[in-house]
Design a protein with these regions (language model features):
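A short beta-strand-turn-helix
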Residues: 34-54
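Short, thiol/selenol-centered motifs that function as redox-active sites or metal-ligating centers
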Residues: 61-69, 135, 187-190
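Structural microenvironment flanking redox-active thiols in thiol-disulfide oxidoreductases
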Residues: 68-109, 116-126
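Bacterial Sec-dependent N-terminal signal peptides
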Residues: 1-26
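Short active-site neighborhood of thiol/selenol oxidoreductases, capturing the structured segment around
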Residues: 47-68, 168
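Short, internal strand/loop/helix patches
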Residues: 105-149
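Thiol-/selenol-based redox modules, centered on thioredoxin-like
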Residues: 139-193
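Short, small/polar residue-rich loop motifs at catalytic or cofactor-binding pockets
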Residues: 29-30, 53, 130-132
């Protein structure tokens, strides 16, 4: 019986290891240029931001309570870093959230950074983004320097690790990002297919 338990434990640990490795392999290392329109129908390309010291891409939602819990934090981080050469791009890829809803949500929540609509979740698919909010920090060559969560708690008062801020501070100091990957948490992106 003991040997059976050890055998089953070994299988479980091996499966867990492969699942973890597979999840890590799913992260993109470099983004491709893309074109999307914002809620005012203005077209943007990722390359429009190539002169930035860092480009923060945040997959966001209007209806997700987790993403909405981060609205004020996203805006605070944007305000803190916008004059330091950091570009911010919000991307809404949820099929059920219209451009008008995205526009209204941005105005209601005072989100002043660029917010683009990914109509057929093409960009979410290319980034392999799974949830909202989910962050990708790129350099001017579109290499992914950080991927994951904004911080470690849905409740602002419980935050212990400000992962996005930490990554941005290291980038702006010319350092290598210490923690390049964290687990993003939130609502799944509602895809077309």
């Amino acid at each position: 019986m003991k040997s059976l338990n050890k055998f089953l434990a070994a299988i479980f640990i091996t499966a867990l290891l492969f699942a973890t490795l597979k999840a890590e392999d799913n992260s993109i290392k470099k983004a491709e240029n893309f074109k999307l329109k914002d809620y005012n129908w203005k077209e943007y390309q990722l390359s429009d931001f190539k002169d930035s010291k860092a480009i923060v891409i945040i997959f966001i939602a209007t209806q997700c309570p987790v993403s909405n819990a981060y609205n004020s934090r996203m805006e605070k981080i944007y305000e803190e870093y916008k004059n330091k050469g950091v570009a911010f791009i919000g991307i809404n890829s949820n099929k059920q959230e219209s451009i008008e809803e995205v526009k209204e949500h941005a105005k209601k929540n005072n989100l002043n950074f660029v917010i683009l609509k990914d109509v057929n979740n093409v960009i979410a698919d290319k980034f392999k983004a799974a949830v909202t909010p989910e962050v990708f920090v790129l350099n001017s060559e579109f290499d992914v320097l950080y991927h994951g969560r904004i911080d470690d708690s849905r409740k602002e008062e419980d935050v212990k690790s400000e992962d996005l801020r930490n990554a941005l501070n290291e980038i702006l100091q010319g350092k290598k990002v210490t923690k390049t990957e964290t687990k993003a948490f939130g609502c799944t992106i509602k895809r077309v297919n």
